[in-house]
Amino acid sequence: MTETTKTHVILLACGSFNPITKGHIQMFERARDYLHKTGRFIVIGGIVSPVHDSYGKQGLVSSRHRLIMCQLAVQNSDWIRVDPWECYQDTWQTTCSVLEHHRDLMKRVTGCILSNVNTPSMTPVIGQPQNETPQPIYQNSNVATKPTAAKILGKVGESLSRICCVRPPVERFTFVDENANLGTVMRYEEIELRILLLCGSDLLESFCIPGLWNEADMEVIVGDFGIVVVPRDAADTDRIMNHSSILRKYKNNIMVVKDDINHPMSVVSSTKSRLALQHGDGHVVDYLSQPVIDYILKSQLYINASG
């Protein structure tokens, strides 16, 4: 497949990130490597979206702290960014709402094709530049002027870098304004972009708990967007999917990262990290990056069981 015929992917991870761990970052890396090896996808960005403060989970520290820790954790990445939208809303947002927000945002700022996982490329949803009258899809048959793959990828990369890769100094605590004027964007037929939910097998298993998830939301998340699962603790994802009629229905939309490498970070969790911090366990350096540890100690977070 050529670069332009491959599906371009943005991986979106929702969660508490209380705190964000090395395991979370490795989850992104493993998912990207796996998707690239399939030969069908190009991962062009990763988004960390911390949950709103009103989520109500015991021990959840304020979103301001969690956003800063996430920013510190990804500061050396050239493709993963932290998005504050979910935290800045008036109340808690469903995972489905967060996915839809980012899909709509990508339509506005990239102008490229955004497809649902089940939508064939001949019937795409076309992104429109904000505050601009819709124009016909590019149909110029003049080879000399028609966008090349390099031009297409360059334009998409330019737009995404403005919203996905802006890394302001943490102390200023200013994030990119999603409504900022990004200028006129070109529109293309050649690029197909999807936003996939990135999660661990624990979230996948939560889909099987009766009443925990809204079934209509599950249909959209799995049926329209699709999921990339990075298993934890050697979880049996096939068994998990067989316990949910919706997961069985859309099993082809669920990509499970499978590799032969033993990943020690797959057993790292935020809970384990908090316990290590509370008990002064030196193994915390195996769970969290040093900038995150330094911030936690400076802010005196997680020093007791209540967070």
UniProtKB/Swiss-Prot annotation:
Pathway in which the depicted protein is active: Cofactor biosynthesis; NAD(+) biosynthesis; NAD(+) from nicotinamide D-ribonucleotide: step 1/1; Cofactor biosynthesis; NAD(+) biosynthesis; deamido-NAD(+) from nicotinate D-ribonucleotide: step 1/1
Subcellular compartments: Golgi apparatus membrane; Cytoplasmic vesicle membrane; Cytoplasm; Cell projection, Axon
Positions of S-palmitoyl cysteine lipidation: 164-165
Control of this protein's activity: Inhibited by P1-(adenosine-5')-P3-(nicotinamide-riboside-5')-triphosphate (Np3AD) and P1-(adenosine-5')-P4-(nicotinamide-riboside-5')-tetraphosphate (Np4AD).
Expression across tissues: Highly expressed in brain, in particular in cerebrum, cerebellum, occipital lobe, frontal lobe, temporal lobe and putamen. Also found in the heart, skeletal muscle, pancreas and islets of Langerhans.
Superkingdom as given in the UniProt entry: Eukaryota
Binding-site positions, ATP: 24, 271-274
Outcome when changing residue 92 to G: Abolished nicotinamide-nucleotide adenylyltransferase activity; abolished ability to promote mono-ADP-ribosylation of ribosomes
Positions bound to NAD(+): 16-17, 92, 95, 200, 202, 212-213, 232
EC number, UniProt record: 2.7.7.1, 2.7.7.18
InterPro entries the UniProt entry points to: Cyt_trans-like (IPR004821), Euk_NMN_adenylyltrnsfrase (IPR051182), NMNAT_euk (IPR045094), Rossmann-like_a/b/a_fold (IPR014729)
Membrane topology summary: Lipid-anchor
Gene Ontology CC, one term: axon
Matching Gene3D superfamilies: HUPs
PTM comment: Degraded in response to injured neurite. Degradation is caused by polyubiquitination by MYCBP2 after recognition by FBXO45. Palmitoylated; palmitoylation is required for membrane association.
Activity vs pH: Optimum pH is 6.0-9.0.
Reaction(s) catalysed by this chain's protein: beta-nicotinamide D-ribonucleotide + ATP + H(+) = diphosphate + NAD(+); nicotinate beta-D-ribonucleotide + ATP + H(+) = deamido-NAD(+) + diphosphate
Alphabetically ordered keywords of this record: ATP-binding, Cell projection, Cytoplasm, Cytoplasmic vesicle, Golgi apparatus, Lipoprotein, Magnesium, Membrane, NAD, Nucleotide-binding, Nucleotidyltransferase, Palmitate, Pyridine nucleotide biosynthesis, Transferase, Ubl conjugation
Signal peptide extent: none
GO terms under biological process: axon development; NAD biosynthetic process; negative regulation of cytoplasmic translation; neuron projection maintenance; nucleotide biosynthetic process
Disulfide bond entries: none
GO molecular function, one term: nicotinamide-nucleotide adenylyltransferase activity
Subunit and partners: Monomer.
Family listed: Belongs to the eukaryotic NMN adenylyltransferase family.
Function: Nicotinamide/nicotinate-nucleotide adenylyltransferase that acts as an axon maintenance factor. Axon survival factor required for the maintenance of healthy axons: acts by delaying Wallerian axon degeneration, an evolutionarily conserved process that drives the loss of damaged axons. Catalyzes the formation of NAD(+) from nicotinamide mononucleotide (NMN) and ATP. Can also use the deamidated form; nicotinic acid mononucleotide (NaMN) as substrate but with a lower efficiency. Cannot use triazofurin monophosphate (TrMP) as substrate. Also catalyzes the reverse reaction, i.e.
Protein name: Nicotinamide/nicotinic acid mononucleotide adenylyltransferase 2
Upper lineage: Eukaryota, Metazoa, Chordata, Craniata, Vertebrata
